[in-house]
Amino acid sequence: MRVIVTGGGTGGHIYPALAIAKGILAQRPDAEILYIGTREGMEARLVPEAGIEFSGVSGQGLPRKLSLETLKVGGKSFKALWETKQILKKFKPDLVVGTGGYVAGPVVLTAALFGIPTLLHEQNALPGITNKILTRFVRKVMVTFPESIAHFGVQKKLVLTGLPVRAEIGNISREKGAEDLGLRSDCLTLLVTGGSRGARSINQAMPTVLKHLAGRKDIQVIWATGKATYQETLENLKAQGIQWQRENWRVLEYLKDMPEALACADLFVGRAGATTLAEIMVAGKPGILIPYPLAAENHQEFNARALEKDGAACVILDQDLTGENLWALVQGLLEKPEKLRKMAQAARGLGQPDALNKIVNVCLDTAWK
């Protein structure tokens, strides 16, 4: 069995594609996997590091406004179609799976026109433009959120699978998670993160929250600021006279122990990227979600609203975020254990812990061999 996976531009497209590739290999060790991405994108580094064969093609995201650059990008897309055609002829795949991003367009389209079985996976509640266009050409579209189904034209092609998350998510005890982080398992724990790059608006609001929590030994804080804003955040805390090095606080540049942190957390504060939300849903954690305002087509707000609608999260728009209104929400939830419990139950009900198996089964059912 020979499979091509493709997706790129951001980690939100790359990591699901890698998870699918590894999931297929776990069930079919004899499978041959080829990842097609752009030569300049993150995938050119991440895919070989993951031990998956990589082939690069031309590609670049379309500018939001028509310009000379638009013509240049269009030229690269036509070149990518030709390059993809050559790769398909040589590799002869039994299946092509796309996870979105501009590189997936020419790869999935060319494969579909060749009659090769093709699949898409959509991570967000609001589908990306590439996946919406490709829907008419592929065999099936696997989706993460039920809310995205209405945005696709061909309903019979849609399969609700969820988004793959790390195997550790939801499978570590609260006690083990707290122990690994040097925290207590019998205290309320607030987990705050803006992702690996951080979120300046969240980092600017958090000092107010810490001021209110300074005398609270019963509430622990895990706060990952992101590498880009770590020093700036520490300087801000110092300027405000906040002693952040406390026994029950962890102010970190990057949180490498996310499964452990989620295991011992009672409340999550952060952005609303699809992978983040898939993880908090599988872990069954209530969220205060602050969608990234510059996400393509505002898809993070659509993601966040999907959880809010089902009672699993509260949403604050980035433009409305202040230290005091963040604290008001945090306090209002941490001091209402029954509400937290109901939100956690709602989040867990939305989770798809078996997402990868569902996706792999669709892949195996669709492939030629």
Curated annotation (Swiss-Prot):
Instruction: Please give the GO cellular component terms listed in this UniProt entry.
Output: plasma membrane
Cross-referenced CDD domains, in alphabetical order? GT28_MurG
Gene Ontology biological-process entries: carbohydrate metabolic process; cell division; cell wall organization; lipid glycosylation; peptidoglycan biosynthetic process; regulation of cell shape
What EC number(s) has UniProt assigned to this enzyme?
2.4.1.227
Q: Which residues bind UDP-N-acetyl-alpha-D-glucosamine?
A: T10, G11, G12, N124, R166, S196, Q300
Q: Which domain of life is it from?
A: Bacteria
Instruction: Spell out the reaction equation it catalyses.
Output: di-trans,octa-cis-undecaprenyl diphospho-N-acetyl-alpha-D-muramoyl-L-alanyl-D-glutamyl-meso-2,6-diaminopimeloyl-D-alanyl-D-alanine + UDP-N-acetyl-alpha-D-glucosamine = di-trans,octa-cis-undecaprenyl diphospho-[N-acetyl-alpha-D-glucosaminyl-(1->4)]-N-acetyl-alpha-D-muramoyl-L-alanyl-D-glutamyl-meso-2,6-diaminopimeloyl-D-alanyl-D-alanine + UDP + H(+)
Where in or outside the cell is it found?
Cell membrane
Per UniProt, which keywords does this protein have? Cell cycle, Cell division, Cell membrane, Cell shape, Cell wall biogenesis/degradation, Glycosyltransferase, Membrane, Peptidoglycan synthesis, Transferase
Q: What is its membrane topology?
A: Peripheral membrane protein
Part of which pathway?
Cell wall biogenesis; peptidoglycan biosynthesis
The EC category is transferase
Q: Name one GO molecular function term.
A: UDP-N-acetyl-D-glucosamine:N-acetylmuramoyl-L-alanyl-D-glutamyl-meso-2,6-diaminopimelyl-D-alanyl-D-alanine-diphosphoundecaprenol 4-beta-N-acetylglucosaminlytransferase activity
What does the protein in this record do? Cell wall formation. Catalyzes the transfer of a GlcNAc subunit on undecaprenyl-pyrophosphoryl-MurNAc-pentapeptide (lipid intermediate I) to form undecaprenyl-pyrophosphoryl-MurNAc-(pentapeptide)GlcNAc (lipid intermediate II).
Please give the HAMAP family that the UniProt record associates with this protein. MurG
Protein family (similarity comment):
Belongs to the glycosyltransferase 28 family. MurG subfamily.
Protein name (database record):
UDP-N-acetylglucosamine--N-acetylmuramyl-(pentapeptide) pyrophosphoryl-undecaprenol N-acetylglucosamine transferase
**What does the organism's lineage look like at the top?**
Bacteria, Bacillati, Bacillota, Clostridia, Eubacteriales
